[in-house]
Amino acid sequence: MTYVLQNVVFPLDRDPDLLPLYVDPETWSTIADEPVRVSSRAQIGNILDRRRARIVAGRRVSFGTYFNAFPASYSQHWTAVRDVRLRIRTTGPATILVYRSTGTGARQRIDTREVDGAAESVFDLVLDQYSDGGWIWFDIVADEKNAVFEGAEWTTEQEPARTGKASIGITTYNKPDYCIW
C-alpha cells in the first residue's frame, strides 16, 4: 500500500509574500560587495490552484522550498522510511531535474527526465546518505512552450508506525477547581 508523506502544494490565497515558501525562493548573491537578487522566477499569476501551476516557456521553477522540498535527513534520522517515491504529473514539454543537498548545503543532481504531453514521472529515492543533513527537491524547466505542473506527492510503501504512549501530569494536588473549569 502507498502512503503519502507529503503533497506538493501552493498557497491558498494569492499573497505574493507567501509564494517563496512554496516555490522558487529568492536567491541573493554579492557582486562588488553589494547584494544582488539573482532570481525571481515564480509569479503568483502562474499558480492555477492549490496543486497546479503554469511554467512559462523557457523558464525554470524550483520546488526547493520550505513547504515542498522533502526533509531527507530528518526522515532518515527519525523514521523507519528508507525508500521514497516522488511522483510528478505534468502537461506539455518540460525537463524535470531532481536534486539533493548535502549537510554542507552543496546541491547535487540525482536524476533528470524530459517529458512532453500528459506525463507522470516517477523517481525512486533511497534515504541512506543523509546522516549529516540534506533535502530532496525538484525543478521544472519549460521547453519552447508553456508547461503545466499538475501535481506531485512524496510517498512510501513503508507502513507508518502506529505505536505511541502519552502521559498526563497534573501539577496540583486535591484542587479539582484548578483543573476543571
Question: What kind of feature is each model-predicted range?
Answer:
Residues 3-161:
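Beta-strand-enriched, solvent-exposed domains that form extended recognition/catalytic surfaces
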Residues 165-169:
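Cell-envelope/extracellular polymer assembly enzymes that use nucleotide-activated donors
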Residues 172:
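Phosphate-binding glycine-rich loops and their immediate beta-loop-alpha structural context
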Residues 175-181:
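Short, well-formed alpha-helical segments that are part of the catalytic scaffolds
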